[in-house]
């Protein structure tokens, strides 16, 4: 299993199909399965760190916009605009770097029941909302669930 890189691979496959991420809940579930590295049914903060480490090309513990979007564009150029929008969401303190503070904040948003782990349902809810929010960057103007 390859953390968020698997997301990109999955979305890349979707892009060959016209980049229709619908049904969003199915896309989100595929992403969850790929990111639940130990397959225990929960996504943890440690798994988030592992997921984002693939983008950290200089291995300094922070992910710049350039690192993130370059990785996405290399693997899935059709997601260029979406990658910038997601980076803006992830960079919670707007300091142009994704670091521990941003990872913790993003994790807390996803962990709606505050049990220090993200269930498949919490993951699905987060990503379906993201896909709908940014549908104009990847979809065909029709919300799906």
Regions found by a protein language model. Give the residues of each.
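Cleaved targeting-peptide boundary
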Residues: 16-26
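General zinc-binding finger modules coordinated by cysteine/histidine
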Residues: 61, 66-85, 94
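Terminal recognition/anchoring or ligand-binding modules at protein termini
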Residues: 107-136
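Glycine-aliphatic tripeptides that mark coil-to-beta-strand junctions in extracellular
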Residues: 41-45, 61-65, 96-100, 116-120
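Primarily EF-hand calcium-binding motifs
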Residues: 27-37, 46-57, 83-94, 100, ...
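Short, charge-rich, low-complexity alpha-helical interaction segments
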Residues: 3-6, 57-62
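C-terminal helix/juxtamembrane-tail motif
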Residues: 16, 131-145
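Cleavable N-terminal signal peptides of Sec/SRP-targeted secreted and luminal proteins
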Residues: 2-18
């Amino acid at each position: 299993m390859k953390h968020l890189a698997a997301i990109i691979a999955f979305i890349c496959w979707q892009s060959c199909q016209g980049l229709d991420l619908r049904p969003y809940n199915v896309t989100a579930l595929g992403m969850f399965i790929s990111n639940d590295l130990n397959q225990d049914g929960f996504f943890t903060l440690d798994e988030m760190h592992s997921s984002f480490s693939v983008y950290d090309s200089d291995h300094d513990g922070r992910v710049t916009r350039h690192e993130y979007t370059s990785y996405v564009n290399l693997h899935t150029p059709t997601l260029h605009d979406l990658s910038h929008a997601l980076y803006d969401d992830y960079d919670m303190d707007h300091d142009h770097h994704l670091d521990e503070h941003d990872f913790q904040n993003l994790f807390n948003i996803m962990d709606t029941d505050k049990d220090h782990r993200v269930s498949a349902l919490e993951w699905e809810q987060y990503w379906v909302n993201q896909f709908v929010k940014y549908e104009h960057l990847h979809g065909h103007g029709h919300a799906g669930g």
